[in-house]
């Protein structure tokens, strides 16, 4: 990961998961990055990206747990990467860079993200073609 100030937290700016998200008003959950356990998922319905949060960020365990089950819109994820430091709350992510602050709310709790892990495992279980 790139250099960070001591005590600042964020995702690695090279991990641009927002690029894998759908741009589809009919499937708003797919426009989001989904956090489950120590994993972050993004999909457009054709491809799925899965990254271990503890490897693509410098977030501590409490911050990773606070993300569990949350959806963050892809545009918010993209903008979040522009900041030096993030704080995670129940409602969203507060971002800081010098005197600039922003708050990105998590997506509506009524949105349901598809079971990406089930899709990945079913694909991996298929026999390979020689």
Task: List each model region and its residues.
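Extended macromolecule-engaging scaffold surfaces
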Residues: 1-130
């Amino acid at each position: 990961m790139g250099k960070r100030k001591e005590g600042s937290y964020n995702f690695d700016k090279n991990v641009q998961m927002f690029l894998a998200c759908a741009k589809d008003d009919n499937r708003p959950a797919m426009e989001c990055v989904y956090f489950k356990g120590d994993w972050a998922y993004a999909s457009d319905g054709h491809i799925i990206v899965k990254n271990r949060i503890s490897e693509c960020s410098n977030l501590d365990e409490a911050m990773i747990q606070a993300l569990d089950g949350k959806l963050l819109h892809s545009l918010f994820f993209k903008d979040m990467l522009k900041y030096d430091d993030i704080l995670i709350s129940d409602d969203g992510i507060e971002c800081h860079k010098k005197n600039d602050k922003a708050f990105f709310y998590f997506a509506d709790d009524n949105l349901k993200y598809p079971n990406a892990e089930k899709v990945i495992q079913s694909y991996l279980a298929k026999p390979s073609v020689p």
